[in-house]
């Protein structure tokens, strides 16, 4: 493996000059730069990231904790983070925790050992334990995204879930729906509580009664949506519309309802949440609440860079505003 001394010897310059050319830390004549880069190419020389990190006190590496990167919402946010990391010359270490305490603990320890410059957190489970683990590493800059735990030492980007729940429900009401069901994620999740609060606000504003039996608990995955679809199919009196708290459940619900002979939106209307890429291409295309996922990823990375540069500034909370995307899964009844 070639060293910086080998490059300097082949180029006929000092190791200091090679360092300045590679790191762009000082003006070097163009002819000299060309000689150095030619030697770098011939020797297939790669600078030592370890040595550079020791000298600069920076590894240019970011860690990211996610519950499940295969989740379509998470994957689009991750894509945004990775894209901006690459553009800024940072490496992203992605850690799938599966919501498992031991994996969260071990990954945080590993990221600390690797001296990452900062950590992005997008986990939805074991919030108190995760908060405590993150707070133990107070020297590492952090940004918590979406469902993550509140931390006294981390900036946070959140979705205005209460407003999103309100917008989805109001759109159904504006289209003549009064018998509305909700398919939530786990009830203990803050985002779910806020979306239910938005649902209740819209129903109260329209002076409509709420059937508490129609506020149904899922897990943000298709399997519970299938069970709920079967439950709705068996109901003597069905809701005319279902507000699903993410698009994955909405698509699973629609698929199963249609398998059961219930047409969407002719028999039951469906509205989702997230606006994942697949929502536009499903049949029928899903009406949903849009979350700017790639922008969330970009903003999270930019905020983390600011925190890395200034570790002492006060904790900040950034709120992303939801928008409705109208497609073809809500029937107009009025």
UniProtKB/Swiss-Prot annotation:
Protein's GO biological process: negative regulation of DNA-templated transcription; purine nucleotide biosynthetic process
Annotated GO MF terms: DNA-binding transcription factor activity; transcription cis-regulatory region binding
Subunit (UniProt): Homodimer.
Its job: Is the main repressor of the genes involved in the de novo synthesis of purine nucleotides, regulating purB, purC, purEK, purF, purHD, purL, purMN and guaBA expression. PurR is allosterically activated to bind its cognate DNA by binding the purine corepressors, hypoxanthine or guanine, thereby effecting transcription repression.
SUPFAM superfamilies: lambda repressor-like DNA-binding domains, Periplasmic binding protein-like I
Domain notes: Consists of two structural and functional domains: an N-terminal DNA-binding domain, approximately the first 60 residues, and a larger C-terminal domain, approximately 280 residues, which imparts the function of corepressor binding and oligomerization.
Residue range(s) of DNA binding per entry: 4-23, 48-56
Pathway: Purine metabolism; purine nucleotide biosynthesis [regulation]
Record keywords, A-Z: DNA-binding, Purine biosynthesis, Repressor, Transcription, Transcription regulation
Protein name from the UniProt record: HTH-type transcriptional repressor PurR
Residues annotated for hypoxanthine binding in this entry: 73, 189, 220, 274
Domain HTH lacI-type: start-end pairs: 2-56
One Pfam family, short name: Peripla_BP_3
